[in-house]
Amino acid sequence: MPIKIPTELPAFKVLSNENIFVMNDSRAKTQDIRPLKIAILNLMPKKILAENQLLRHLSNTPLQVEVKLIQTKSYVSQNTPIEHLEKFYTYFDDIKEEKFDGLIITGAPVEQMEFEDITYWNELTEIMEWSKSNIFSTLHICWGAQAGLYYHYNIPKYKLENKISGVFSHWVNDENADLTRGLDDVFHVPHSRHTEVKKEDINKISELEILSESKEAGIFIVATKNRRKIFFMGHPEYDRNTLKEEYLRDREKGDDVEIPQNYFVDNDINSTPKFTWRGSSNIIFGNWLNYCVYQNTPYDINEISE
């Protein structure tokens, strides 16, 4: 979908240079169709980078997508210019009377903390509760997925002995499932986390199903059977160099971290990482937008309800 974003947003230039179709407001108004309204609750520290990654995957298909960027009020990002936040972001209080076709809740580097100890936890739970009646399909990513499973289903996270970091092979559990339609028998997805959720906990919830998993990385995609809530345990949105940048950051902090698996050529951190998940990621995000959102959301957005 051509994505409707402000011309001044850094992602506009980045995506245009990649030959991805982006649309400014004036052009969007000349198309007599209802755009999909997608909100992004961006909890990542480097918000501009996360914007670029997610908007890239929401772009370049036949329909319009109108994006609203949301930041938390209870915690102000220390890694994104305040001018950028003031210009392009809004607060939940400003949009909570609206309805959206989709919501993306990103990951955040807070997974080793207890959920209730996180500064913005109360605000996040208010948003997740609101999403049940104001969002048609909510996509939770990595820590956002763990937070969503904990809030909605009381599914805990467990600390791993060693951080999972790398690009891992996955399989599809149901080849007829809409979210995984078109994926190869074996496909790759990056993971980067210190915690996990367990299969036996998810299997106790009849409303949930595990659509994809990995021998090395564990569960990847969990979804409600009606697709109103989707949970990605990995990071299909990551760019080629994101895992590298995270590894170098952790090493500079003095953390005892291993080189991301199946990523660098011959484990040489000076090499250009292998980008082996771009195709599968495009399919996964496209499937969410098409099958979980566009094909089922009501034409009158005000009809969205729990």
UniProtKB/Swiss-Prot annotation:
Positions annotated to bind substrate: K163, S192, R249
Keyword Transmembrane helix recorded: no
High-level lineage: Bacteria, Bacillati, Bacillota, Clostridia, Eubacteriales
Main location: cytoplasm
Pathway: Amino-acid biosynthesis; L-methionine biosynthesis via de novo pathway; O-acetyl-L-homoserine from L-homoserine: step 1/1
Cystines in this chain: none
Compartment annotation: Cytoplasm
Site (Important for substrate specificity) residue list: S192
GO-annotated molecular function: homoserine O-acetyltransferase activity; homoserine O-succinyltransferase activity
Residues annotated as catalytic: C142, H235, E237
Keyword terms, alphabetized: Acyltransferase, Amino-acid biosynthesis, Cytoplasm, Methionine biosynthesis, Transferase
GO biological process per UniProt: L-methionine biosynthetic process from homoserine via O-succinyl-L-homoserine and cystathionine
Identification of the protein by name: Homoserine O-acetyltransferase
Gene that specifies this protein: metAA
Enzyme class: transferase
EC number in record: 2.3.1.31
Pfam families: HTS (PF04204)
